[in-house]
Amino acid sequence: MKDLGGLMKQAQAMQQKLADAQARLAETTVDGTSGGGMVTVTLMGNGELVRVLMDESLVQPGEGEVIADLIIAAHADAKKKLDAKQAQMMQDAAGPMAGLMGGLPGMKF
């Protein structure tokens, strides 16, 4: 039974680490770029788009479709980076128990 108590303590500690990691992630921002840096978007840790920066040379008549495509590409770049950062933070928080958590609902590793 000692082992069970130790396992429960480990699980509670990991749960706290995961909650802390999720809180840090909520405050995290990532940038995604496209068009060789002509468009940059910033996402919060929850995926919310909070900023779009564009090179002024893009703001010309007839460039609307190009701008839209570049924004979408920059968003996809930022989302990919955010997903990688989320996975790494959760992996780090779970520590040696990460392998056990992969099969649990709601746990992304």
UniProtKB/Swiss-Prot annotation:
<keyword id="KW-0238">DNA-binding</keyword>
<dbReference type="InterPro" id="IPR036894">
    <property type="entry name" value="YbaB-like_sf"/>
</dbReference>
<dbReference type="GO" id="GO:0003677">
    <property type="term" value="F:DNA binding"/>
</dbReference>
<protein>
    <recommendedName>
        <fullName>Nucleoid-associated protein CCNA_00269</fullName>
    </recommendedName>
</protein>
<dbReference type="Pfam" id="PF02575">
    <property type="entry name" value="YbaB_DNA_bd"/>
</dbReference>
<dbReference type="InterPro" id="IPR004401">
    <property type="entry name" value="YbaB/EbfC"/>
</dbReference>
<dbReference type="GO" id="GO:0005829">
    <property type="term" value="C:cytosol"/>
</dbReference>
<comment type="subunit">
    <text>Homodimer.</text>
</comment>
<comment type="similarity">
    <text>Belongs to the YbaB/EbfC family.</text>
</comment>
<dbReference type="GO" id="GO:0043590">
    <property type="term" value="C:bacterial nucleoid"/>
</dbReference>
<comment type="function">
    <text>Binds to DNA and alters its conformation. May be involved in regulation of gene expression, nucleoid organization and DNA protection.</text>
</comment>
<keyword id="KW-0963">Cytoplasm</keyword>
